[in-house]
UniProtKB/Swiss-Prot annotation:
Residues 1-18 form the signal peptide. Pfam families: Peripla_BP_1. CDD domains: PBP1_TorT-like. The lineage of its organism: Bacteria, Pseudomonadati, Pseudomonadota, Gammaproteobacteria, Enterobacterales. It comes from Escherichia coli O157:H7. It comes from the Bacteria. This is Periplasmic protein TorT. Its main location: periplasm. Belongs to the bacterial solute-binding protein 2 family. The gene is torT. Keywords: Periplasm, Signal, Transport.
Length: 342
């Protein structure tokens, strides 16, 4: 019997979860645990995936999970990236490319918070919402955690880590009106409410290392009292580098995991990172698409559990379903052949 679990924050690392248990979110704070079910593709389906960008290793790891699942289940996969956030016109054109290719389902990692005329454009093609929510009525299933939680977990960790000491935090949640930035800020605010942890400023900008580095330098000049940077993985990477130039190194917390953030955890440069297990999410997106195409039962949303990673527990076992292997390069097209399945 499924049990509705209220959000007890230690829950995300509970060993009582089976390795393959999934979460179905009822809202940003409540979820149900559900078992992962076996799956077999009945034929070679054609899936087309859209990402905002592969500049961020978050999407690179998700891409790895997708191509692994495509190989495992014997389906074709085409991948298109928009080159950044707020690229609605580009992604609309890419959906047309997917249709011309003969895609039977769209796996949509949107670069915007809404996707006007999606129903008109995709017609009867199933759409799996990937990571970033667009609240479109025609989307029947979403793969991804509430971004509220990806801000809440780091905020809660900081409050505990500070032991009552005041902290001055710069938030760098990524692009404005895209990628869950607003929800992560809301989650962080909720977590630190009533504590001496204070948000000094919020710096919004695209997930590009130069943009994030310039934002950080501007904010440090404007607010020299900043001692903590909490934000996207790329913001964390910028903060790790900037810390070398300061008398007192910045404390760095990341809202999600990347390869650089993982190295920062191992070296003690990052004190905490949340992980929504991107490789696993890529696999789930392919599985949800196959199920929907085969007329099987599909949950309206599904995600892996969120991991809270620190220098003490950041090891290969904890990240095996989060990060793509070292040296992995983006796969833009995978075509199933009989030889590929052997």
């Amino acid at each position: 019997m499924r049990v509705l679990l209220f959000l007890l924050l230690s829950l995300f690392m509970l060993p009582a979860f089976s390795a393959d248990n999934l979460l179905r979110w009822h809202d940003a704070q409540h979820f149900t645990v559900q078992a992962s079910m076996p799956l077999k593709a009945k034929r070679v389906w054609k899936l087309c995936a859209l990402y905002p960008s592969l500049k961020d290793s978050y999407w690179l790891s998700l891409n790895y999970g997708m191509q692994e699942a495509a190989r495992r289940y014997g389906v074709d996969l085409k991948v298109l990236e928009a080159g950044g956030y707020s690229q609605l016109a580009t992604q609309q054109a890419q959906i047309d490319q997917c249709k011309q290719w003969g895609a039977e389902a769209i796996l949509l990692g949107s670069s915007t918070t809404s996707f006007p005329d999606l129903q008109k454009q995709v017609a009867n093609l199933p759409v799996i919402e990937l990571v970033n929510a667009i609240d479109a009525p025609q989307v029947k299933s979403r793969v991804g955690v509430p971004w509220f939680q990806m801000g809440y977990q780091p905020g809660r960790y900081l409050v505990q880590w500070a032991h009552g000491k005041p902290l001055n935090v710069l938030l760098m949640p990524g692009p404005d009106n895209a990628g869950g930035s607003k929800e992560m800020v809301e989650g962080f605010r909720a977590a630190i409410a009533g504590s001496p942890v204070r948000i000094v400023d919020i710096a919004l900008g695209d997930n590009d290392i130069e943009i994030q580095r310039n934002l950080l330098q501007e904010m440090l000049e404007r607010h020299p009292e900043i001692d903590v940077v909490a934000g996207t993985a790329i913001a964390a990477e910028a903060a790790m580098g900037e810390g070398r130039n300061l008398k007192t190194p910045l404390t760095v917390v990341s809202f999600y995991l990347s390869h650089q953030v993982y190295r920062g955890l191992k070296r003690g440069r990052v004190i905490m990172a949340a992980s929504d297990q991107m490789v696993w999410q890529g696999e789930l997106a392919v599985e949800q698409a196959i199920r929907q195409l085969q007329g099987q039962s599909v949950s309206d949303n599904v995600s892996p559990p969120i991991l809270v990673l620190t220098p003490k527990n950041a090891d290969r076992e904890h990240i095996r379903r989060s990060l793509s292997p070292g040296g992995f390069r983006p796969v833009y097209f995978y075509q199933h052949t009989s030889a590929a399945k052997k």
